[in-house]
Amino acid sequence: MGAKDYIGSLFLKELVKGMALTGRHFFARKITVQFPEEKTPQSARFRGLHALRRYPNGEERCIACKLCEAICPAMAITIESEQREDGSRRTSRYDIDLTKCIFCGFCEEACPVDAVVETRVFEYHGEQRGDLYYTKQMLLAVGDRHEQQIAADREQEAKFR
């Protein structure tokens, strides 16, 4: 420790530098958001609650290819399918366990018909474990409720897909 360092520590140079830094930021504009009352803007790529979409004629989009089930790293998706009378295949069961889901978005990327999507909805809860187990009917209801926002987000992000 040299004489210069000794004199600097004697006059508490580090303390003064720290106080100066604190003083500069003390009067700066606050950036804290008071969450329930104020909301920050969300990206169109936000990954929230899952939804199943329908075509404009009301028919569900999912063709039961099971790509989303295969690619899910958390194994949160369960699909069962059945043949229709017209020969096409559709889901008879499509369940997502949100307690397992890591919201990675792989299911959304793997879907060839844009049937399963992640919405901007993040304010949902469950009081029991079973409340976070979404069935096909629940996912279709979420999709029907938020279809306008989903379609707008898909249109905005189309050039990046």
Curated annotation (Swiss-Prot):
A GO BP entry: aerobic respiration
Subcellular location(s) of the protein: Cell inner membrane
Xref: InterPro entries: 4Fe4S_Fe-S-bd (IPR017896), 4Fe4S_Fe_S_CS (IPR017900), NADH_quinone_OxRdtase_chainI (IPR010226)
Bound how, and how many: what does the cofactor note say? Answer: Binds 2 [4Fe-4S] clusters per subunit.
Which residues does the annotation say bind [4Fe-4S] cluster 1? C62, C65, C68, C111
Task: State its cofactor.
Answer: [4Fe-4S] cluster
Which EC number(s) does the record attach to this protein? 7.1.1.-
The record describes the protein's role as: NDH-1 shuttles electrons from NADH, via FMN and iron-sulfur (Fe-S) centers, to quinones in the respiratory chain. The immediate electron acceptor for the enzyme in this species is believed to be ubiquinone. Couples the redox reaction to proton translocation (for every two electrons transferred, four hydrogen ions are translocated across the cytoplasmic membrane), and thus conserves the redox energy in a proton gradient.
Q: Hey, which family's this protein in?
A: Belongs to the complex I 23 kDa subunit family.
Q: What is this protein's name?
A: NADH-quinone oxidoreductase subunit I
